[in-house]
Amino acid sequence: MRAPASSLHRPTVEWFAVTLLCVLLTLVSAVEGWLWRIDQTLYDGVLSAWTQPASDDVVIVSIDDASLASIGRWPWSRRVHAALIDLAREAGARAVVLDLILDAPSPDDPGADMALARAIHHQGRVVLPMTQATTGAMLSGEVRPLDVFADAAAAIGHSQVEFDPDGIARSVYLWEGFGAARHPQISLALLRLLEPEAADRFPPPPAGDDLDHQQWQRANWLRMPFSGPPEPTPTIPTRPS
């Protein structure tokens, strides 16, 4: 006896329906960001479980409540930062990252700028940050340190980080800049000073003729392999004396 034609086609129809449903679920997941959220949750979980000791040759000098209570309200005189750099040099610091945007002269004490520039020069290995300049909502250029500081510094690096849609920073671009990705990320700028052979693994991108030189350019995206929460890194409050 021959089977009815409808029963022969039923498995095909069912598999087609299942396949179509899977495709639709995948499309909806991609549009709604469900897969991205799952991926980031797994990534965060792996990083939380994977801990490694913080480097013992890195110290964070923080601007915290104790520092503000001791020195006074922000912003501080640049003589304070100069004194801190001098103390770091005397203590034998191999390098200093001064994570402050120094794009304008000191309005109340011009001599403080020269004091800070001298301290940067004498230390010999100070890295300064640069960042994006904006006009309204548009990126319009670069915010760089004043020449007096840039000339004294050993290196300048960009301080941009990438924030994901959930507001968490998990990655950076190792090279960025307006018109061309010419500036290393500030941590890479430090590595280039202290361990140039290790930094050679992250060379600058080739200069392309097809780049839009009126746009902010980025290259070499990298997820940050966090060693854990910030607490393990030795941190001390600012004490200039």
Model-derived regions, located:
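Extracytoplasmic
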Residues: R239-S241
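Terminal and domain-flanking low-complexity segments
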Residues: P232-P234
